[in-house]
Regions:
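Aromatic-anchored segments of alpha-helical transmembrane domains
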Residues: 38-46, 96-105, 147-157
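Hydrophobic transmembrane alpha-helices
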Residues: 2-4, 18-81
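Short, highly charged, low-complexity non-transmembrane loops/tails of multi-pass membrane proteins
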Residues: 196-214
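Membrane-water interface at the C-terminal end of transmembrane alpha helices
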Residues: 130-135, 183-200
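Short helix-perturbing small/polar motifs within transmembrane alpha-helices
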Residues: 38, 116-158, 190
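Membrane-helix boundary connector in multi-pass membrane proteins
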Residues: 159-171
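Interfacial aromatic-anchored transmembrane helix boundaries in multi-pass membrane proteins
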Residues: 98-127
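Hydrophobic alpha-helical transmembrane segments
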Residues: 31-36, 72, 76, 88-96, ...
């Protein structure tokens, strides 16, 4: 049995593939905006590190491990970058840039470990966006991306900073990181994107055009 593909079908398939490839291709404006987001949030990361001691101490005293919830501020860059740029690698790139900036300004945890944490946390958010094939950018996905980044943060911290921690501490820390990641990184990033879109700052991005057509 011989099968043949009509020129029309071949052309349609080629067009679909080309459109998908173009949609995922980074533009100069994508790189610039992702970098700006990374730098801006990197300064926030650094500032959060400066006040971290007074903030985390009473929370940790209340329940050891609970301090992972506010630590989720350090995973917001990846979710925000992913929601704005909507391209493969955006979450990872933005979180990594933020970590590098924070490390360059000065991090109490050391430059290399700060950058390593950014890499891991960015991958956590990136994985969630990849699972949805970079096609779904709704609120639940933003929450899941934040939760994924929070989970990655918890695993990384438990391996590097809390090795041998008691099971109860590890459980509380992980749950707190996931919930904090979802609410702080996912929720706040989603709200930030909507605010920027309404202000017209994202008109060159699908995130901005999409909201304006609703």
């Amino acid at each position: 049995v011989h099968t043949s593909t009509s020129p029309t079908a071949t052309s349609a398939a080629s067009g679909t593939s080309s459109t998908s490839s173009h949609r995922f291709r980074w533009r100069v404006v994508d790189i610039v905006v992702a970098s700006v987001i990374g730098v801006a949030v990197g300064v926030v990361f650094w500032a959060w590190g400066v006040v971290w001691g007074p903030i985390s101490a009473p929370i940790e005293a209340l329940l050891p491990g609970l301090q992972a919830a506010p630590a989720a501020v350090w995973v917001i860059a990846g979710v925000l970058g992913g929601l704005v740029i909507r391209k493969p690698g955006a979450a990872l790139y933005t979180e990594l840039v933020a970590a590098v900036v924070s490390a360059l300004i000065g991090s109490q945890w050391g430059g290399l470990l700060t950058i390593e944490a950014g890499l891991v946390q960015g991958l956590g958010a990136e994985l969630v966006f990849a699972i949805f094939l970079y096609r779904n950018w709704r609120f639940p996905v933003a929450l899941l991306a934040g939760a994924g980044a929070g989970l990655a943060m918890a695993i990384n911290d438990l391996v590097l900073w809390y090795a041998g921690a008691a099971p109860l501490f590890a459980t509380v820390y992980t749950i707190s990181a996931v919930i904090g990641g979802a609410l702080i990184a996912g929720g706040l990033a989603w709200l930030a994107v909507r605010g920027l879109a309404r202000a017209g700052a994202l008109d060159r991005f699908a995130a901005g055009r999409e909201l304006r057509t609703v």
